[in-house]
């Protein structure tokens, strides 16, 4: 799966660089400097590959640590409340307790600037009788609210999915497309990861194709892994790489 992710982004980078190269040729900018530019592009490609490999290593480590942290926090909450995982359904208070416990960890990941968002989803819902409840799942999704040409120096976090009281408690700005829960039909790879056999988690990472984030115009790729509790998959977690974030980390080569 790592190889698939690497190839996906590398192809995108090379496509952008090739387009720039063609435009400059047509414009006659470097009729006598083609060799020099070719060398520049080669160096740029090598640097991009190195940067991307470092990014993937960071994301894999973050995803694994997040999955393990969710397992610990959920187990602790359920043990303290003398509940089972099935008791999360139709229990807004218990769901809120778990989301409060996990909010700090998601904020830490987003602030690390190694991605444009972080999320977790558990196989439970606030109201099993609500319309669409069979495809609705609890969880948190935090996103960076300042990814663009000016970088992330003035980064702030937006609350995209989760219990609104958690956002208020943590003083996090609500995303203008906020929803309480995830529609798993809009979460690439969710069903695949829920069928994970419970062995080595890193072997099950799932890289989505580029998709439009639900309710927005933004293009993103999601890198997800399972959340395992007592040997059974109980949800998924992961990070978001938006197109804006990608363009910031891997800028086009300048002439």
For each feature predicted by the language model, list its residue ranges.
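Juxtamembrane extracytoplasmic/periplasmic/luminal helical "stalk" adjacent to the first N-terminal
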Residues: 2-97, 114
